[in-house]
């Protein structure tokens, strides 16, 4: 069970970091005229 908990914590941490960086710096790949 501990493995499942550690995996969940790792995934959640990576997700939070990804969203923090993603929202902090808007993606430059998408054009301004796009969605």
UniProtKB/Swiss-Prot annotation:
**Biological process, per Gene Ontology:** photosynthesis
- TM region(s), chain numbering: 3-23
Presence of keyword Transmembrane: yes
Which InterPro entries does the protein's record reference? PSII_PsbT, PSII_PsbT_sf
GO CC field: chloroplast thylakoid membrane; photosystem II reaction center
Sorted alphabetically, which keywords does the UniProt record give?
Chloroplast, Membrane, Photosynthesis, Photosystem II, Plastid, Thylakoid, Transmembrane, Transmembrane helix
Summarizing the function annotation, the protein's role is: Found at the monomer-monomer interface of the photosystem II (PS II) dimer, plays a role in assembly and dimerization of PSII. PSII is a light-driven water plastoquinone oxidoreductase, using light energy to abstract electrons from H(2)O, generating a proton gradient subsequently used for ATP formation.
Name of the protein in its database record: Photosystem II reaction center protein T
What organism is recorded for this protein? Gnetum gnemon (Spanish joint-fir)
Q: Which gene encodes it?
A: psbT
């Amino acid at each position: 069970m501990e493995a499942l908990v550690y995996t969940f914590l790792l995934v959640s941490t990576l997700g939070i970091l990804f969203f923090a960086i993603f929202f902090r710096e808007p993606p430059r790949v998408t054009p301004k005229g796009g969605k």
